[in-house]
A protein has these predicted regions:
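N-terminal loops that bind phosphate or other acidic moieties
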Residues: 1-338
Length: 338
């Protein structure tokens, strides 16, 4: 099924974002106040449970149907030496995902997540966005719809991740264009490039921002001009999840960059999202601040693949277990606070 058959359909969806169920959220908050613990003593675990109650539209949210989706794409901008690895590694890692041998396989399994891997035209990289638009409008819509397609009504949680050699350059370009800031604000080592590689990334992004300066600054155009297929797919998944009231757990810098242009246009797009972690990529902390998202974890991770979000999913599962399984003061015959 095509969720966004046109740019207008995408923009209409972005302009009409459903709210959570405030009644369910209030009921969950009231339940937290009655559980056998001092109020607030479980910290953010309480907040997470209440958050999921609102978006799942039930007082006692669950994680029976939790999915991790990893999108993969290749980038034409790699011709400028912005990555430490060749583009062929993207397809090799997709094969590794499908064989069950990657970090995301182990971590999603440990967190009880169903894993879906979506490879997006790996033999057809996006264009070099420092010279032309990364994608045509049709290609960008296809990528948005590929992301939307992984979201099913009734999912309890959607964990998002990516794989794509060169995509940290695209992510930095998206952030620079979205927030009007210098490329160097967002550029980091990515897969491990040296100082010369970082300089090349900054130069490529500066040229891209200048080349596309006169183009519309809409969310769609930013994704199309300097994004990647896997990044646009994440944007499509986040938007579709909002339409279906599915809470989202975001991974690192590249994953979060996908919603930066959407958030500039519609800040409320982040309301159904949790940041799984803050990665070691320098731009991620700044991006989370711009998106007003507080990460659940900070473990120095910088792998991508949805790995940090998968670890955070185990924290979410723990939050829901406490919310559901703890006794109330009345049930346990324990005196509450006075």
């Amino acid at each position: 099924m095509t969720s966004y058959g046109s740019i207008a359909a995408f923009e209409a969806a972005l302009s009409d974002l459903p709210a959570p169920d405030w009644v369910a959220e209030a009921a969950a908050r009231a339940r937290q106040a009655q559980l056998t613990k001092p109020a607030g003593s479980l910290g953010r675990l309480e907040d997470v449970a209440i958050f999921l109650a609102g978006w799942q539209r039930r007082e006692r949210p669950r994680m029976d149907r939790a999915r991790a989706a990893v999108f993969a794409g290749n980038h034409g901008v790699t011709v400028h030496g912005v990555s430490a690895f060749p583009t062929g590694v993207t397809a090799q890692m997709v094969a590794n995902f499908r064989a069950g041998g990657a970090a995301i396989n182990a971590l999603s399994g440990a967190a009880g997540l169903d894993l879906k891997v979506v490879a997006l035209d790996l033999d057809r990289p996006t264009a070099d966005f420092s010279a032309v638009a990364a994608m045509t409008a049709a290609e960008c819509l296809d990528a948005l719809n590929a992301g939307a397609a992984v979201v099913e009504e009734g999912l309890d949680l959607l964990v998002l991740g990516e794989m794509g050699i060169g995509n940290s350059t695209s992510a930095a370009a998206i952030c620079a264009r979205s927030f009007g800031s210098a490329a160097e604000t967002w550029v980091g080592p990515g897969t491990g490039v040296d100082d010369a590689g970082i300089s090349r990334k900054i130069d490529v992004i500066d040229r891209a921002i200048a080349r596309h300066a006169s183009a519309p600054r809409s969310a769609f155009e930013t994704l199309r001009l300097v994004g990647g297929r896997e990044i646009a797919a994440i944007a499509g998944a986040v938007l579709r999840a909002r339409q279906l009231s599915v809470p989202v757990l975001l991974d690192g810098f590249i994953c979060c960059s996908a919603i930066a242009p959407l958030a500039v246009e519609r800040p409320a797009i982040t309301a159904h999202c949790l940041a799984g972690h803050c990665s070691a990529e320098p731009g991620h902390a700044r991006l989370l601040e711009q998106l007003d998202l507080a990460p659940l974890l900070s473990l120095g991770m910088r792998l991508g693949e949805g790995s940090g979000a998968a670890v955070a999913a185990a924290v979410v599962r723990a939050a829901l277990a406490a919310h559901d399984q703890m006794a109330t003061f009345a049930q346990a015959a324990v005196s509450g606070s006075t």
